[in-house]
Amino acid sequence: MDVENLIITTLKDKVRELTGNEMDIRLDEPPAINMGDYSTNISFRLAKDLKKAPKMIAEDIANSLSILGIEKIEAVNGYINFFMNYSDFSKETVSKISAEKENFGKLEKRDEKVILEHTSANPNGPFHIGHGRNMVIGDSLKRILIASGYDVETQYYVNDMGRQEAIVVFGNERFELDKSKKADHAIGEVYVETNKLLAENEELEQEILNLMKNYEEACEAGIENELTEKFKNAVDYSLGGFKETLSTLNIYHDKFVWESEFVKSGMVRDVIKRLMDTGKVVEDEVFRLDLSDYGLEKKLVLARLNGTSLYSTRDIVYHINKMENCDFAVNLLGADHKLTAVMVNKTLALLGYNEAEVVFYEFISLPEGSMSTRRGRFISMDELFEEAKSRAAEEVRKRGVAENEEEIEEIAKRIAVGAVRYNIVRIAPEKPMVFRWDEALDFEKVGCPVIQYAHARCSRILENVETISNDNLFAYEMNENEKTIVKLLSKLPKIVEKAAEVRKPQIVANYVLDVAQGFNKFYANCPVLKEENETIKNSRLAIVNTTKTVLENTLDLLGIEMPGKM
């Protein structure tokens, strides 16, 4: 029974009865349960039409309504407050979660295919924490969209044709790869050294341009030769390191799409011709696409005069390929890509395709400062994770929850994944953020350990409980802590629906912290195993059991596992 929707439907009927008109109604939640579970201000909105004071309208409406699942309706200063019957509501909530288990929070399947592109870092060095924000938000959004019923395919767009990769190929012939290091880190060292070499010897720049031109020509002709093999090997080597980092954080892509695929297939040349035929292309030192009809003053550089393509052209082709294979596409991009994203989307519109949705994220830094790949000064995601794991292991040892080093390592790894992922995803993408260790590994207030610790508490309470009797559950006057946690638990499906709808995974992150904090208040104020009244004891055990399920299901949406012990 969806009490909230029942209230809204009943109020809409009442408004129609009073005015003959429709009204869009949204309910608020009072700050404390003793003030009601839901509240509406419709009396103020009706005052003009009914020519009555809001206070009087509220009292009339409150006295005239009867809603299933609501035990009291109260008019206070023009507002109408609704109080749920928590005995029935709690039984229904606990029963639903217990029956659905790991499926609680998942919505009905939709017949819609989504292509979600995230991470897509150039294969010229390890991921830095800016890439980390992209991958964590992207993977969390993927999980939330799947839970909300979409068929989701995640893609990583591999830039194997750009200047950066040509520099890596050029450098691999002059500097030895350190095979003792993780692949992407070794490639990164070559890239940094090669950039230094190019800065000191400007005449070498022509060799980079020749590599790019020769590689594209080989791809366009469908030729596989020594040069194409060098590019393929360099990219594959770096991707091996990338996949290792991603899997450490429980992130997996369904498909790696190489930029060169679209040159080899002839699709790039076909799209350039289609754009030329629009009459919107102008020629100066390059071919440029005029998008002024879409309010863009800057022209999109489409191709060189010799016909070779540019990254922007290949990106448009990649997006056409996506749009032809999905109902809608979502991209995760840094805020510095806003203009490029708009230009790509308007080019798609010009050719008659749907535009991609874009989730932009702002920069992330550490308190020590920001990162730069090109100059070789950056904090890699691998370093960030190892630091998180080291700090987590120290905390696990201090708390004495495990003595075996192997067990400490496993617990620390799960805490570290949670610390990194949760601390990133909890902040709205459009806000710049500083990654702070005291927040990421906070066991008391805002960190993922707070949530994982609440789960560990649930597990400890339940470890020796064989069965939970369903007899007379919640057949007593529940206190505010019990009501608060049950109401929170019931919200997961709507949280998933909302987060998917607005593409904001931080909604899920904020919700799961609320659940953990609500449970901790319940735990502090409501004895469970020591409760002597069997009805109350079993009801509280049911709350603990369903809290454990909701914490597991919700953190799974964020790609985070439970350590078990903490």
From Swiss-Prot:
GO biological process: arginyl-tRNA aminoacylation
Gene Ontology cellular-component terms listed: cytoplasm
Entry's localization field: Cytoplasm
GO MF term list: arginine-tRNA ligase activity; ATP binding
Database matches in Pfam families: Arg_tRNA_synt_N, DALR_1, tRNA-synt_1d
Keywords: Aminoacyl-tRNA synthetase, ATP-binding, Cytoplasm, Ligase, Nucleotide-binding, Protein biosynthesis
Motif ('HIGH' region): 121-131
EC number from the UniProt entry: 6.1.1.19
Family: Belongs to the class-I aminoacyl-tRNA synthetase family.
Protein name, per record: Arginine--tRNA ligase
Organism annotation: Methanococcus maripaludis (strain C5 / ATCC BAA-1333)
Gene giving rise to this polypeptide: argS
